[in-house]
């Protein structure tokens, strides 16, 4: 009999390092790739893996995310175990504290244990909603069952110099976890490879009994911790639970012959920009065109992209770029850029290495270079952005350490 698997996506992250893109939306709701939201990749991983029972746990500035899920992610009304349901923080009442919001990743799940009970889950897959990657959850689940584990953690080998930003594991020769350290200042390396650490991707599969016991112990019982990485996983090891690591690099993706190496935490503006620019390269690391691993999102009703004018010096043209529906390149040039829905660039404008969100308009003779423009911005004719950072800062734009300029949503010139 096929096990009952419940998917839970943690989508309440604030994403403060992505400001100003997260001033009015949560991190999982940030647009990516011209037509997607960051959360779409976690949802697609579940659906492409045959997990159709999904709860999305939301908290911080969730309206944009709520509208996206409700508009674009719906199953038929007659399929009982096929659902994608939003679960906002509902001020769960603790006897000693009164009503509280989600206080951490583990607390978000703890406050919704009744959903797991009602579903009668055998296994619970708890995944982060703010990373860019593909993952065959079914393969990870099979590894979890084969190992007879209580908890399985998706693991990503990473250079030790960067591992301090993540949870780090030590494992034995069978990949059973022997130690878990959350964001250690001096991450341990792997045996035989001291320059590489085994980091947690923030994706877990729990056997239901172990999950319920650990959450009750960590949150409502003897413990005082509300986070999986800081509290629940170290507690699981201390209490003798079988905690297994799962090698993400061995995760098979249908239609992809190369090893599965791509996983990005686009938690900073520079990381977000770098991941975006990968998509427009000739051979991107992250392939969004694999028909055997479709990437669904909210349906768009925009007309096809359009290029107009062909006079010399005024040709509507784009090179090495992604253009969503409704885009009009009207006598301007676009290079190495991502243009989201209903963007319009006017004659003699030049857009280079940029990410433009929905409903951005670029005026005549304007020049943009290495710029992220949030939605609903009208850029006047002759405007230059990204070419003089002092001028950009004077307008109130964010300029990153790598020189990426960010224009906030609905900015008025």
Curated annotation (Swiss-Prot):
PROSITE patterns tied to this protein: ADP_GLC_PYROPHOSPH_1 (PS00808), ADP_GLC_PYROPHOSPH_2 (PS00809)
Gene Ontology molecular-function annotations: ATP binding; glucose-1-phosphate adenylyltransferase activity
Top-level EC class as recorded in UniProt: transferase
SUPFAM superfamilies in alphabetical order: Nucleotide-diphospho-sugar transferases, Trimeric LpxA-like enzymes
EC numbers on record: 2.7.7.27
Annotated alpha-D-glucose 1-phosphate binding sites: 102, 167, 182-183, 200
InterPro entries reported for this sequence: ADP-Glc_PPase (IPR011831), ADP_Glu_pyroP_CS (IPR005836), GlgC_bac (IPR023049), GlmU/GlgC-like_hexapep (IPR056818), NTP_transferase_dom (IPR005835), Nucleotide-diphossugar_trans (IPR029044), Trimer_LpxA-like_sf (IPR011004)
Keywords of the record: ATP-binding, Carbohydrate metabolism, Glycogen biosynthesis, Glycogen metabolism, Nucleotide-binding, Nucleotidyltransferase, Transferase
Pathway assigned in UniProt: Glycan biosynthesis; glycogen biosynthesis
Gene Ontology BP, a term: glycogen biosynthetic process
Reaction it catalyzes: alpha-D-glucose 1-phosphate + ATP + H(+) = ADP-alpha-D-glucose + diphosphate
Family: Belongs to the bacterial/plant glucose-1-phosphate adenylyltransferase family.
Subunit comment: Homotetramer.
Function summary: Involved in the biosynthesis of ADP-glucose, a building block required for the elongation reactions to produce glycogen. Catalyzes the reaction between ATP and alpha-D-glucose 1-phosphate (G1P) to produce pyrophosphate and ADP-Glc.
Name of protein: Glucose-1-phosphate adenylyltransferase
């Amino acid at each position: 009999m096929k096990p009952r698997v419940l998917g839970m996506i943690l989508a309440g992250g604030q994403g403060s390092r992505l400001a100003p893109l997260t001033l009015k939306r949560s991190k999982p709701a940030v647009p990516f790739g011209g037509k997607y939201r960051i959360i779409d990749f976690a949802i697609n991983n579940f659906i492409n893996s045959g997990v159709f029972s999904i709860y999305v746990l939301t908290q911080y500035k969730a309206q944009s995310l709520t509208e996206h899920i409700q508009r674009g992610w719906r199953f038929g009304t007659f399929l009982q175990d096929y659902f994608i349901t939003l679960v906002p923080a509902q001020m769960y009442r603790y006897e000693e504290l009164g009503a509280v919001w989600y206080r951490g990743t583990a607390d978000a799940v703890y406050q919704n244990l009744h959903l797991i009970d009602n579903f009668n889950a055998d296994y619970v897959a708890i995944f982060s909603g703010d990373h860019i990657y593909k993952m065959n959850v079914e393969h990870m689940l099979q590894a979890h069952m084969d190992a007879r584990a209580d908890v399985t953690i998706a693991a990503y080998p990473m250079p030790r110099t960067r591992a301090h930003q993540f949870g780090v594991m030590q494992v034995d020769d069978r990949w059973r976890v022997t130690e878990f350290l959350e964001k250690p200042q001096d991450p341990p390396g792997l045996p035989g490879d001291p320059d590489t650490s085994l980091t947690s991707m923030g994706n877990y599969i729990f056997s239901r009994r172990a999950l319920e016991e650990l959450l009750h112990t960590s949150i409502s019982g003897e413990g005082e911790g509300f986070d999986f990485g800081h509290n629940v996983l170290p507690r699981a090891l201390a209490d003798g639970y079988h905690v297994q690591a799962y090698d993400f690099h061995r995760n098979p993706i249908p239609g992809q012959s190369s090893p599965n190496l791509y996983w990005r935490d686009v938690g900073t503006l520079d990381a977000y920009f770098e991941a975006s620019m990968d998509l427009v390269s000739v051979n991107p690391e992250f392939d969004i065109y694999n028909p055997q691993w479709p990437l669904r999102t909210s349906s768009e009703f925009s007309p096809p992209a359009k290029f107009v004018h062909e006079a010399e010096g005024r040709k509507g043209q784009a090179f090495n770029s992604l253009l969503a529906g409704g885009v009009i390149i009207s006598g301007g040039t676009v290079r190495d850029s991502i243009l989201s829905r209903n963007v319009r660039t006017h004659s003699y404008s030049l857009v280079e290495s940029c990410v433009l969100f929905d409903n951005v308009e670029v005026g005549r003779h304007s020049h943009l270079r290495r710029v992220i423009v949030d939605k609903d911005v009208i850029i006047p004719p002759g405007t230059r952005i990204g070419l003089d950072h002092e001028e950009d800062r004077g307008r109130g734009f964010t300029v990153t350490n790598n020189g990426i300029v960010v224009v906030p949503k609905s900015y008025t010139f």
